[in-house]
Amino acid sequence: RELSASKRRFVWSRYIGGFYLRKNLKMITRKKEIWDNILALSLFWSISQVVLAIFGQYAKTYLHITNTIYVQGSMALAGFGIVLGSILAAKLSRYYINAGIALLGAMGVTLITFLVPHLGSIEIIAPLFLLFGVFSGFILVPLSANIQHLSPNAHLGTILAGNNFIQNIFMILFLMLTTFFAYFGMDAKMLFVLMGFVGVVLFWLLAKRYSVLFVWTLFELLASLRYKVVYKGLENIPQEKAVLLLGNHVSWLDWLFLQIPLRRRINFLMDKEIYHWPLLHPVLKAGEVIPLSPRGFKDAMKEAVRRLQKGHIVAIFPEGEITRNCEINPFHKGFELIDSFEWDGVLVPFYIDGMQGSIFARCKDGRKKPLFRREVHVCFFTPQSKGISALELEQFIKRKRYEC
């Protein structure tokens, strides 16, 4: 049984012999995602350390700047950028720890590191350092939070200490390599390029694990430019159990509004003809969309049940199509077939409001707002009985929609 931290004895012989080091390293590598996050943070800090170390020499040699105020002022902008990037990262992680933005951060850091040695003006490089800081915040906030979130409480202190240990080892090694390369004549430009390739490794490491979250992050960023989405009832979506989402269908973007606040991927049912559109098919297949057609209806429902039995989230629009009259149309009974199978989870009704009159909606009610952000409301209501009929569900949502 694990001893509490206050009852553990520190033994010097074990420390000198490397027993504690081996034990702690084994602990931080036990969960692969934690280890990947630690490696990513270590690579990031190594890049940052080297860039800050060589920029002074680069500015003197290639920009002919000897006044340290300009050099230090440019690098100080990275610090302001980290603050700004951290605030933005927190905003993008308001529903869950969005590690997808770390991939965006890695992309930005890598591109800037490659770009700096090709620029000959401090007036251009200084704003790039600000952006470097913003992208750094995108990396630091979600990955650091993710390490703490994934770590067992009993070992959190050890894992955080191990995280700092690994990061410092990486930074020391990279500074030693920088000194070594500089000693043998590699100039600052080449070192920038070398750090750019380290950034490529960082991007690849994060892309292996968070590429799907990254794509959803891009969707969310694009949507936020035009829509302000307000959610209600997110507490009705369990973190782990299977969920069957059923609700109205008002626009082509309903799938996006449902997915944004949920870290778990939603398995949508979609018309088979749209599913097989050449440009969309690879994306929809990768997104585990379930194709639906009159002939293959039962097979689609059985596949939905299999996903639910695995604990996934499945979403169905019982209206069968996007509404053309801005009202909730009669619900089809097809989803009732799912109730004839056993699966452990909840049935959660939802209602989407605010897209009427949008270019992505079929109903036009005069509520066009071409110059303003549109406010969209998405409500997840309390779970209902799995045996609920299509008519009962339709009436329930019609009653509850006024609370949204």
Name these PLM-found stretches.
Residues 84-98, 182-183:
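Helix-to-loop junctions at the C-terminal end of transmembrane segments
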Residues 68-69, 151-163:
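Loop-to-transmembrane helix entry/capping segments in MFS-fold secondary transporters
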Residues 326-391:
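A cross-family acyltransferase "interaction/gating" segment
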Residues 3-38:
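Juxtamembrane intracellular "pre-TM" segments in multi-pass secondary transporters
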Residues 91-107, 188:
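Cytoplasmic membrane-interface "Motif A"-like loop-to-helix N-cap segments
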Residues 26-84, 138, 172:
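A single, central transmembrane helix in multi-pass transporters
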Residues 107-121:
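C-terminal ends and interior cores of transmembrane alpha-helices
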